[in-house]
């Protein structure tokens, strides 16, 4: 089917829209996409309003989505709750978690200093200063994220929980060669692979729509491809993606005190 062939019957689809894809909404809710992260569909309506019948009566699709939203915690909530309880270098004590994070931040700053020296070769003084400022901003951002100082509205308890969860993400990724961290690392990797697959699907969907209708207004009144491109910026597991920006090469990660405790345990052997 060509783009012009599609135009022969496209108007008959109105006012139907991808906004009415209840199954996709259920998947997003189950995984943990927050309402505050969603892009407005326009006209002051939410994605839940788009699922209702003309006149505002609830449809079966709307009821399914509402039931999904009310049905307990999301996968993201459960995953992050587990991560906040993962022992860091053998301890869950807040002071030990902070000690690990500060040691890691020191290694990150040292690594960025090394990168700056390598990249400065052949650059003009002004360019070196620009690069220095970028690395300084990266160091500051890493500290704010890992120590959970990036949300001034968070309570002390929320900040402590986030700090523990982010430390666990970093710990698992940085020491994934340790036997007892192998399956946690595989889990986190699978989560990112899942979200990557969703992002690829969104991108391909947007490009297919653009190929057939260009930048036209959507049948449901949306901005069309512009709206679809914005949804491709969704990140459900934002902290997991952020940690990827903070990883260090194996030789640069700080040594931990209890690496032996993350090895294999064989009963009956000394």
UniProtKB/Swiss-Prot annotation:
InterPro entries: Trp/Indoleamine_2_3_dOase-like, Trp_2_3_dOase. GO terms for molecular function: heme binding; metal ion binding; tryptophan 2,3-dioxygenase activity. One of its GO terms (biological process) is L-tryptophan catabolic process to kynurenine. It comes from the Bacteria. Belongs to the tryptophan 2,3-dioxygenase family. This is Tryptophan 2,3-dioxygenase-like protein.
